[in-house]
Every structure is written in C-alpha cells, then in structure tokens.
C-alpha cells in the first residue's frame, strides 16, 4: 500500500527526504522557522557526508540557518574522532547514521523587513569522498512567510448587533401644521375664506390616510392653537383656544371620529416661529429684533421694545409679512399600529417604515443574507426612523464597520450605549480597522468577559495571529 504522507509533505533528494509542517512565522522582532524532517528513506554511502543548509533568501540577502550533517557509518566515526581531538562542539546538527528517522527542526532568527518576501531554500551537498562524484543542489522549500501584517490584513473581525426589545404597543402619530385664516377677531372656520380650502383638504387627507389603513387605530387627536405675539397675552390665549375649538367642531362634524378623542390646548404665543422667520428673512433690523427676543424676558416689555425699533416701521412691516404665518393650529393624530411578521415587514419597510418597530426591522434585516444590500438597507432605514435610539445607532455602526466605513461608524457609535458588550466589541473592531491592535485586543477582552460571542471569536483570532507559532 502507498504510504500516507503528512499534510503538505514535500520530497527532496530524489524522494529520499521528506519535509512537512513547514512554517515561517514572524512575531515582533523574530522569525520562527519550523519544519519536520523525515529521513527514514535516506541512504548515505559509508564514507560519505550529506550537508543540508536551510537558506533564507530574497535574491539580494542570504541568511543560512543551522546546518544539518548526516554521515555514513565510517565517515561518522572519523568525524567524532576529529571532534574529540580538537575538543570542539559541533556547530551543525548531527544526525547519527543509525537514527535517520523523523525530527523537528526549529530556529529563531532576528526578523528583517526584507524577509516578508523571502523564500526558504534547501542547499544540499553530498561530498565526493571515497571516489564518489560530489553532488550539489538547491531546492525550494517554501516562499510563504507569515508576517503579522499579512495575518492581520487577512483577518475580518466580527461585528456585534443588539436585538431591540419588543415594542408591545406601537404608538405613532401624524401631525399637520395648519395655517387657517379667520376674519379679524373671529373664530369661525369659513371653508372658502382665503387659503382655508387647501389647508382643510390637507387635514382631511391626513385623516383619510390613517382611517383607511386597516393596520392603524386612532387613539387621540390633539389640536393646539398658537397666536402671533402681538397684543395682550390673555386675549391671544382666549382667541387661539376659540380657533382651535372651531377646528375641533369642524372635524367632529366632518370626520368619523368620536368627539371624546379630541383634546384642545393653547400652545402659546408663537415666539419660536417668529425667531425662525426672522432668521430666514432679509430684514435689515432682524438682528435687533432677535436680540430683544433673546434678552428681554418680560412679555409686555418685549412687545413694546419690538414696536419701537426703527420708529415702528419695521414692526408694521412684520405685522403684515410675518405675523399672519405665526397664527397656526397644529393637528396631531395619535394612533397604534398592528404587529407585522417578517413577510409583511419586508413590504412595509419599503412603503411605510415608521409602522415597524425596531425589533420588527431587526427581524426583517436578518431574513436577508448578512452583509447583503437588503440587510444593510434595513439597518440604514432603522437609524433614519429612530435617529436617537441607542440600539439603532449601535446596529448602524456595526453595518458601517462591516463595510470598513470608519467615519460613518464613529458618528453612530457616539449615540450608542457605551456600556454594552456589543459596543465594546465594535469599538475593538473600529480600533482593529484603524490599525490600533493593542486597543482592539483590550476592547475584545473586555467584551469577551461579558460573554459576547463575536468578541470571543475576535480575541481568539487575534491571539492566534499574535502568538508565537512553533511547529
């Protein structure tokens, strides 16, 4: 039967010598050389001597490793006598003629950068003693030098994801900011007055969208009235509330929603809207107005100062151009959404992603192959829908890291919970991809202690890469 050779065994010296388990492993400042010699089939004439020198070379540099000498029977006796006379220790590794079996050869030499592209050759010399013809040869053992840099670049660390908690009741809301027009000091909705028709159509379309969707159930309707900040506050509050009530009455009459679900409130004088409008306007006095609003806390005094700017003309201009837009009613519909399975979720994520909980999105993402376009897209949608959620940000960072997009990953990681094992693992991945191996190792160790499987795998891989390997 044919002999079974060790893995990656190579034949030398006309198939009489077998080498296996060859390893060139750089670690720090050292190169570890290891291989197994099988000399069981080697025959050497009694008077002859075989010299084997593993040679590390890149064509320009040569580093010969420890020589191996195999002597024939008579030659060995002469060799030993010679050593005894000179009282010298042999520098070579002597293989006794009757022990030509299998042995492990290991050497550690200082590592130099040129060695990353070197090859290991076997220089063979069988002496011409006893009237034999001398034989010289050089054969390739390997050109595979395993450097830290090569091993690290081949490693793809695993990112960690967090499965979001189940949202038992999915509460959502839609809001429309209506700028309804009322005759001066009146609070009755006239559907054909100024721009009211368009605004009311928009409110109705919001109601239709929610009421016509069998997956949604209306739970409440909030109507909040805002006033433009001129005149007495008490009067503004009273008028705004009346106008908000007018919208409620109109909707109760025209929409199929119980009046019990409506809640009317006064949102206050719309100073925020005024600041926003001023900032985007080209009024030359806008900075003066903005400073008054920012620095004058008393309501009546603030209004008086605004009226006095530039002799009153800028204020009159604002009354005409800006203030009408500040009188608004926010109409907000609160509703709940049914739960979806993965197949439904795959459709909803494209049509109306806000109807999905983060947990449902996570299930949908993981129904696609990891790292696929659809998988990545779902996590991207999740963080857009829930921009402040820590889990959504952690998972979006994980996706970015898996694509080696470090800038995007950092942006999301800042908003994630820094105390989770998943965050620690992903910090390790970030450090690894950034070339900071020691910090990566520390982060993986931290996460692995907390039981994170991705970190345990990453740590094991990194330890294998960085550990000394001697065959």
Report residues per predicted region:
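N-terminal targeting segments with Sec-dependent signals, encompassing both cleavable signal peptides
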Residues: 1-471
């Amino acid at each position: 039967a044919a002999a079974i050779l060790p893995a990656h065994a190579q034949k030398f010296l006309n198939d009489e010598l077998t080498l296996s388990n060859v390893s060139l492993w750089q670690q720090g400042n050292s190169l570890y050389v290891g291989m197994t010699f099988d000399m069981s089939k080697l025959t050497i004439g009694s008077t002859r001597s075989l010299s084997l020198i593993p040679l590390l070379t890149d064509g320009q540099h040569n580093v010969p490793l420890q020589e191996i000498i195999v002597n024939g029977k008579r030659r060995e006796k002469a060799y030993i006598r010679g050593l005894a006379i000179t009282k010298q220790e042999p520098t070579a590794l002597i293989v006794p003629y009757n022990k030509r079996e299998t042995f492990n050869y290991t050497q550690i030499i200082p590592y130099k950068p040129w060695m990353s592209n070197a090859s290991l050759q076997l220089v063979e010399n069988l002496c011409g003693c006893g009237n034999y013809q001398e034989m010289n040869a050089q054969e390739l053992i390997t050109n595979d030098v395993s450097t830290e840099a090569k091993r690290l670049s081949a490693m793809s660390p695993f990112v960690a994801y967090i499965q979001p908690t189940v949202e038992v009741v999915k509460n959502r809301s839609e809001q429309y900011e209506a700028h309804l027009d009322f005759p001066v000091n009146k609070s009755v909705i006239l559907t054909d007055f100024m721009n009211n028709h368009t605004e009311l159509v928009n409110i109705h379309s919001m109601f239709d969208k929610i009421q016509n969707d069998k997956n949604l159930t209306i739970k409440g309707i909030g109507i909040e009235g805002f006033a433009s900040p001129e005149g007495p506050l008490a009067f503004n509050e009273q008028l705004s509330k009346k106008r908000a009530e007018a919208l409620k009455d109109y909707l109760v009459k025209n929409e199929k929603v119980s009046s019990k679900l409506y809640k009317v409130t006064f949102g206050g004088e719309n100073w925020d809207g005024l600041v926003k409008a001023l900032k985007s306007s080209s009024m030359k006095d806008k900075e003066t107005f903005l400073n008054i609003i920012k620095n004058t806390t008393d309501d009546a005094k603030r209004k008086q100062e605004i009226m006095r700017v530039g002799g009153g003309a800028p204020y009159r201009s604002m009354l005409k151009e800006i203030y009408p837009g500040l009188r608004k009613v926010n109409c907000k519909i609160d509703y709940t959404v049914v739960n979806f399975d993965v197949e439904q979720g795959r459709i909803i994520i494209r049509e109306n992603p806000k109807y999905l909980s983060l947990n449902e999105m996570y299930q949908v993402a993981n129904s696609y192959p990891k790292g696929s376009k659809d998988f990545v897209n779902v996590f991207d949608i999740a963080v857009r829908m829930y921009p402040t959620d820590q889990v959504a940000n952690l998972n979006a960072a994980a996706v970015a890291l898996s694509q080696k997009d470090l800038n995007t990953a950092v942006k999301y990681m800042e908003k994630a919970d820094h105390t989770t094992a998943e965050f620690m693992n992903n910090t390790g991945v970030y450090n690894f991809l950034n070339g900071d191996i020691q910090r990566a190792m520390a982060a993986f160790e931290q996460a692995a202690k907390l039981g994170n499987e991705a970190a345990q795998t990453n740590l094991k891989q990194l330890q294998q890469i960085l550990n000394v390997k001697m065959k």
